[in-house]
């Protein structure tokens, strides 16, 4: 998806967020674009992520609390994964989760770059009240 498409998708996703929400965001270029939009549109959020790109875009924003989930660093994804990330997400609960998978199929569901990322994303889905 091109950058403009990611921006439009990110703007639409913001309609489901309100100041004060606790949200989780996964990894990838769409997630990074989403973080840029969040920074502009909101004054007070708690954001949980295992993405370095999302963290870098949101850190330092007054009114934002950022929780960076650690684990085994995956340089190609610029994200933390593995058992540490999985166990951390099991201990957390958030209002909404925003997953930006590599592909979505009506038949097969979401697909991402690897099993390690998929395991973490599945746990994120289980830890949220609402999934986007």
Task: Please describe what each predicted stretch is.
Residues 53-132:
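Conserved phosphate- and dinucleotide-binding cores of soluble alpha/beta proteins
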Residues 24-27, 47-50, 68, 99-100:
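General beta-strand structural signal in soluble alpha/beta enzymes
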Residues 1-24, 36-46, 60-63:
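HTH-adjacent hinge/linker in prokaryotic transcriptional regulators
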Residues 2, 8, 32, 43, ...:
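Sparse, context-dependent recognition of short Cys/His-centered cofactor- or disulfide-binding micro-motifs
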Residues 18-22, 49-53, 86:
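Short acidic/polar alpha-helix capping motifs at helix-coil junctions
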Residues 26, 32-34, 56-57:
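Phosphate- and divalent-cation-binding pockets in alpha/beta enzyme and binding domains
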Residues 3-7, 11, 28, 48, ...:
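Electropositive phosphate-/nucleotide-binding environments in soluble metabolic enzymes
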């Amino acid at each position: 998806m091109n950058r403009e498409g990611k921006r439009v998708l990110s703007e639409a996703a913001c309609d489901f967020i309100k100041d004060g929400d606790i949200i989780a965001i996964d990894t990838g270029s769409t997630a990074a674009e989403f973080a840029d939009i969040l920074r502009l549109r909101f004054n007070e959020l708690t954001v949980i992520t295992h993405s370095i790109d999302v963290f870098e875009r949101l850190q330092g924003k007054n009114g934002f609390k950022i929780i960076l989930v650690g684990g085994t660093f995956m340089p190609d994804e610029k994200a933390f994964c593995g058992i540490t990330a999985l166990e951390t997400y099991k201990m957390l609960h958030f209002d909404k989760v925003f997953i930006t998978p590599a592909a979505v199929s009506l038949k097969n569901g979401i697909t991402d770059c690897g099993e390690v990322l998929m395991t973490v994303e599945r746990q994120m889905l289980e830890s949220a009240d609402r999934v986007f």
